[in-house]
C-alpha cells in the first residue's frame, strides 16, 4: 500500500505548502485545466444536477455536440460523482481526483509487478511510487482526462499477458475498453503498444505450433476489437465530431528528421530537471535516480534470460526513436503532431523501465558485489558525463547533477548494507522507502504543481450567475461576457455563450469568426473583436460588463449585481430568420479584411457601411489617430508580424496580445478629438501597419430592419429541441445561427426537410412561401450505431465469459472425476496388495 499512500501524502504535503485550498487561497488549475477542464466539469455538473441533456449544449461555443465533448474530456466514469459535488467545490473535486488517481497509478503498477513475478515483497511499492511520481506525472498530472489510462495501463499489460499465456482475454478486454472509453486519445498509444507487446510476449513465450501462434493472434484481435466495441457508444460520436475540426486534416510527413540524441534523452532520467510541456519535444521520463543503477544491474544479471533482455531493450530503443524521429512521433500521436505536451506516450516507456529495474531488484541477493560496484560507477559516470555534455541550463540547474549523485550514493550504500548484512532487512527497507519518498516528492515539488489564485478565478461568479439566472427572455438568446477569464466562461458559469476553446472546435466556425474580425485559432474562437453587427448575427442579446457602459443607443441597462452590469442589445437578430435572397450568393467573405467583409454585407443589403474609416499616422512601431467623431472604435492590424499592441487612450492604457490572429482590437467608446496612441510590443521593431474604424449605429439599425422582416417565432427551446413558426414572403432560405451539424433534424410542417450548410458554417433550410411550423431536434451522428455496437459487444463478451466459465467447470469436473477414479484404482491396488500380504503372512505362520 506504500505505492498508494506515499504519492497521496506527498501530493497533499506539496498542496499544503503551495497554499492550495483549503490550505490557502490558491488552486491547481494549470494550463488546459484552467481554460478547459474546469469549465467543462462545471457544465457537466450543471447538466447532471439540473436534468440537462448530455447530447448538446448551448453554453459552449454557439452550441456544441456535448456527447463528443464529453467523450474527449469527461468520459471517466468517476466524473459522474459530480452529481454529489456542490458547484462551488468543483475545483476541489478535480484536485482530489488527481491526488487519488496518482496514488492508484502507483498501486496499479505495484499490483502488476506482484502478479507478473509472483512475488509479494515490500520492495514492489518502491517502483509503484516512482511510477506515480514520475516525470510524466510531474508534467501532466493536471491533465486529469489522461489519468485513468495511466492508472489502467499496468492492468492492461497483465491482461494481455494472461491472454497470451493462459488464453484468457477478459481482463485485457474490459480494462482496454474502459481505457478507450475514458480517453480515446491516450488509448490510441496504448493500442499501438499492445500490438508491439503481444509480439514481444509471443517471442518470450513462443507458441508450440503454428496453430497456437494463429490462435493467439486471432484471440488478440478479437478481444481488442471487442474492447473498442464496448466503448463505441462514446467513441463513434466523437470520431464524427473530430472530422469537422482543424485536426481532421491528415498530412503525413514527407521527410525524416531527428530532434535530439539518445544520450540527451537518457539524461532526462535525472531528477529535478524541468518538465517540458511546450513545443520542444523533450520526453518527461524521470522515474528515480535508482533506475540508472538498476538498469545496468538488469543488463548484467545472469538470472534474467538474454531473450528477455533483447526484447525489452529493443522496445526501449523503439521508444527513444519515437521520441526523437518526426515520423514515429507523428504516428504515436494518432497521426498528428501534438500541439505542445510532447511525448504523451512516455508513461509506457517509464512502466517498461521500472519493470526491468524491478526484475533486477528481485535478484539483488544473487547479484555479485562486483556487479553492484560496476552498476554504481556506471550510473555515476553517466551523471558526470551528462553534466559535461548536456547544454540546457533552463531545465538543468547545476544542482540537479549533484542531487542525482547523492541519491545514487545513498542507494548504493543501502545495497552495500544489504549485501554485507550490516543492518537488518527491515531497517534497510524502511530507510529505502523514506529515501524514495523524499526523492520522488522533491522532484514533484520542484518540477510540478504551479498554482493560480482561486479567489480571482471565482471572484465574479456569484454575481454573474445571479444576473444570468434572472434573465426572463421569451426567446432564444446568447450572452457575451466582456471581462473573460477563459473562452469557456459560458460553460463555467452556465449561460448560453459564443466563445470556445476545445480540441473539438468546429473548423468552419473558426474560419467564420476570423473572417468577421473575431479572435480564432486552430482549436478556439472567441467573441473578442466582435462588433455590434456580429453580435446581432450571432443572436447575442445580452452583454455582461465589469463597469457601467456609456449610452450609445445600441443597448439598455437590464440589471446590476455587485460589480457586474447586464445590458440588453436592442438590435439582436433571432436564432432563425428568412435571409434576403441576394445575400448568400453576393456577400463576399474572403476579402481578407474583416471591415470590408462586414461592409460588403451592408452593400448587399443596400445600407450604409457599419464601419467607417478614421485617418491615422504610422511611424515605425507606433500609430496615432484622433477620433473624428464620438463612437466605438476598432483597430485592425494588417502586419501579421505584430503580436502585441499597447494602446493609450487619454489616461487609460490597454494591452492586446495575439493580434496576429487577425481580430479587431476593441478600443471602446472614444469621445471626439481624443488622441489615441498605439505601439507594437514585439521584438524586431515590426511596423505597426493598421486600420482604424468607427462603428456606425445607424447602419446597424438599417441592417437589422432588413434582416428581421421574417423572423422565426420560437415556442419551445431546450438543449436538443427548437420549435416555432415562420412566415416567408417569398420562397427562400431560412438562416440560423446554429453551427451546422449533421445531427440536426429539421421538420417543416411535420415533414423532414433537407438541411444545408450556409456560409460554410451555419445550419439552414430552404423554405417555400407562406407560414410554416418549424421544429429542430438533435441526436449526435453515430450515437445510435455506437449504442448498438456497444450493446452487441457487451453481449458477446458476456457470452464469451460464461462459455469460459462453463469450460473451466467441465474441465474441473473432468479433472475431479479422473482424480476420483485414479484414487479408487489406487485404493483397490492397495487393498489387493494388503490382502496378498496378509495371506502371505498366514501361509508363513502355517509353515512354521
Which positions does each model-derived feature cover?
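Membrane-embedded helix bundles of polyisoprenyl
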Residues: 98-116, 121-205, 216-244, 379-384
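A cross-kingdom signal targeting lumenal/periplasmic-facing segments of multi-pass membrane
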Residues: 78-83, 107, 502-626, 640-641, ...
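Extracytoplasmic/lumenal acceptor-recognition loop(s) of multi-pass membrane glycoenzymes
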Residues: 435-455, 467-538, 571-573, 578-600, ...
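Active-site lumenal/periplasmic loops and adjacent helix-entry segments of GT-C-fold
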Residues: 14-117, 121-154, 178-182, 273-281
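Hydrophobic alpha-helical membrane-insertion signals
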Residues: 1-64, 452-462, 466, 471-491
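Contiguous transmembrane helix-bundle modules in multi-pass membrane proteins
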Residues: 167, 186, 310-330, 336-462, ...
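Periplasmic/ER-lumenal interhelical loops and adjacent helix-loop junctions
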Residues: 31, 35-44, 77, 216-219, ...
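Active-site-proximal, structured, solvent-exposed surfaces of multi-pass membrane proteins
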Residues: 40, 603-828, 838, 847-848
Amino acid at each position: 500500500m506504500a505505492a498508494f499512500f506515499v504519492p497521496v501524502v506527498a501530493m497533499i504535503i506539496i498542496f499544503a505548502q503551495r497554499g492550495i485550498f483549503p490550505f490557502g487561497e490558491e488552486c491547481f488549475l494549470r494550463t488546459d485545466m484552467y481554460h478547459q477542464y474546469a469549465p467543462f466539469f462545471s457544465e457537466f455538473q450543471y447538466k447532471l444536477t439540473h436534468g440537462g441533456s448530455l447530447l448538446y449544449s448551448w453554453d459552449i461555443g454557439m452550441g456544441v455536440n456535448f456527447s463528443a465533448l464529453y467523450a474527449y474530456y469527461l468520459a471517466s466514469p468517476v466524473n459522474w460523482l459530480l452529481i454529489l459535488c456542490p458547484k462551488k467545490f468543483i475545483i476541489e473535486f478535480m484536485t482530489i481526483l488527481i491526488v487519488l488517481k496518482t496514488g492508484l497509478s502507483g498501486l496499479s503498477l505495484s499490483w502488476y509487478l506482484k502478479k507478473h513475478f509472483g512475488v509479494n515483497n515490500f520492495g514492489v511499492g518502491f517502483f509503484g511510487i516512482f511510477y506515480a511520481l514520475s516525470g510524466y506525472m510531474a508534467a501532466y498530472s493536471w491533465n486529469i482526462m489522461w489519468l485513468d489510462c495511466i492508472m489502467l495501463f499496468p492492468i492492461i499489460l497483465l491482461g494481455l499477458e494472461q491472454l497470451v499465456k493462459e488464453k484468457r482475454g477478459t481482463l485485457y478486454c474490459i480494462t482496454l475498453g474502459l481505457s478507450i472509453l475514458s480517453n480515446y486519445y491516450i488509448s490510441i498509444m496504448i493500442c499501438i503498444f499492445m500490438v508491439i507487446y503481444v509480439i514481444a510476449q509471443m517471442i518470450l513465450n513462443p507458441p508450440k505450433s503454428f496453430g497456437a501462434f494463429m490462435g493467439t493472434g486471432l484471440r488478440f484481435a478479437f478481444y481488442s476489437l471487442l474492447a473498442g466495441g464496448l466503448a463505441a457508444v462514446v467513441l463513434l460520436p466523437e470520431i464524427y465530431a473530430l472530422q469537422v475540426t482543424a485536426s481532421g486534416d491528415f498530412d503525413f510527413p514527407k521527410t525524416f528528421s531527428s530532434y535530439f540524441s539518445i544520450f540527451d534523452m537518457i539524461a532526462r532520467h535525472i531528477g529535478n530537471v524541468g518538465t517540458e510541456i511546450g513545443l520542444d519535444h523533450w520526453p518527461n521520463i524521470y522515474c528515480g535516480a535508482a533506475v540508472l543503477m538498476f538498469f545496468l544491474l538488469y543488463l548484467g544479471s545472469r538470472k534474467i534470460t538474454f531473450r528477455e533482455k533483447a526484447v525489452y531493450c529493443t522496445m526501449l530503443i523503439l521508444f527513444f526513436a519515437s521520441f526523437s524521429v518526426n515520423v514515429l512521433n507523428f504516428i504515436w500521436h494518432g497521426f498528428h503532431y501534438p500541439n505542445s505536451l510532447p511525448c504523451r506516450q512516455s508513461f509506457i516507456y517509464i512502466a517498461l523501465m521500472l519493470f526491468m529495474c524491478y526484475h533486477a531488484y528481485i535478484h539483488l541477493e544473487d547479484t555479485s558485489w562486483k556487479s553492484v560496484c560496476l552498476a554504481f560507477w556506471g550510473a555515476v559516470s553517466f551523471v558526470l558525463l551528462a553534466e559535461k555534455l548536456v547544454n540546457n541550463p533552463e531545465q538543468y540547474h547545476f544542482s540537479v547533477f549533484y542531487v542525482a549523485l547523492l541519491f545514487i550514493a545513498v542507494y548504493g550504500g543501502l545495497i552495500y548494507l544489504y549485501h554485507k548484512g550490516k543492518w537488518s532487512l527491515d531497517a534497510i527497507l524502511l530507510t529505502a522507502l523514506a529515501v524514495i519518498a523524499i526523492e520522488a516528492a522533491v522532484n514533484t515539488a520542484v518540477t510540478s504543481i504551479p498554482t493560480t489564485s482561486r479567489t480571482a478565478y471565482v471572484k465574479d461568479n456569484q454575481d454573474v450567475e445571479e444576473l444570468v439566472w434572472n434573465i426572463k427572455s421569451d426567446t432564444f438568446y446568447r450572452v457575451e461576457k466582456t471581462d473573460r477569464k477563459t473562452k469557456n466562461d459560458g460553460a463555467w458559469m452556465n449561460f448560453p455563450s459564443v466563445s470556445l476553446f476545445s480540441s473539438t472546435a468546429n473548423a468552419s466556425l473558426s474560419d467564420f469568426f476570423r473572417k468577421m474580425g473575431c479572435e480564432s485559432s486552430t482549436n478556439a474562437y472567441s467573441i473578442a473583436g466582435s462588433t455590434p453587427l456580429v453580435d446581432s448575427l450571432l443572436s447575442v442579446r445580452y452583454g455582461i460588463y465589469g463597469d457601467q457602459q456609456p449610452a450609445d443607443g445600441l443597448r439598455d441597462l437590464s440589471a446590476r449585481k455587485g460589480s457586474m452590469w447586464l445590458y440588453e442589445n436592442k438590435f439582436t437578430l433571432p436564432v432563425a430568420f428568412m435571409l434576403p435572397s441576394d445575400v448568400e450568393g453576393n456577400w463576399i467573405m474572403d476579402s481578407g479584411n474583416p471591415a470590408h467583409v462586414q461592409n460588403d454585407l451592408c452593400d448587399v443589403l443596400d445600407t450604409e457601411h457599419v464601419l467607417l474609416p478614421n485617418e491615422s499616422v504610422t511611424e515605425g512601431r507606433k500609430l496615432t489617430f484622433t477620433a473624428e467623431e464620438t463612437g466605438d472604435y476598432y483597430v485592425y492590424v494588417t502586419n501579421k508580424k505584430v503580436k502585441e499592441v499597447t494602446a493609450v487612450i487619454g489616461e487609460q492604457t490597454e494591452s492586446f496580445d495575439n493580434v496576429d490572429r487577425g481580430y479587431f482590437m476593441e478600443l471602446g467608446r472614444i469621445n471626439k478629438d481624443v488622441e489615441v496612441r498605439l505601439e507594437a510590443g514585439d521584438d524586431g521593431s515590426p511596423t505597426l501597419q493598421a486600420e482604424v474604424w468607427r462603428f456606425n449605429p445607424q447602419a446597424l439599425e438599417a441592417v437589422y430592419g432588413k434582416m428581421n422582416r421574417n423572423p422565426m417565432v420560437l415556442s419551445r427551446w431546450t438543449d436538443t429541441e427548437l420549435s416555432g413558426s415562420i412566415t416567408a414572403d417569398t420562397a427562400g432560405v431560412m438562416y440560423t445561427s446554429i453551427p451546422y451539424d449533421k445531427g440536426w433534424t429539421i421538420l417543416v410542417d411535420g415533414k423532414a426537410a433537407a438541411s444545408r450548410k450556409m456560409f460554410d458554417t451555419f445550419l439552414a433550410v430552404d423554405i417555400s412561401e407562406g407560414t410554416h411550423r418549424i421544429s429542430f431536434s438533435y441526436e449526435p451522428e453515430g450515437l445510435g450505431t455506437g449504442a448498438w455496437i456497444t450493446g452487441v459487444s457487451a453481449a458477446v463478451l458476456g457470452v464469451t465469459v460464461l462459455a469460459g466459465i462453463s469450460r473451466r467447470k467441465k474441465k474441473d469436473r473432468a479433472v475431479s472425476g479422473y482424480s476420483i477414479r485414479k484414487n479408487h484404482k489406487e485404493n483397490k491396488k492397495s487393498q489387493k496388495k494388503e490382502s496378498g500380504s496378509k495371506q502371505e503372512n498366514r501361509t508363513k505362520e502355517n509353515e512354521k
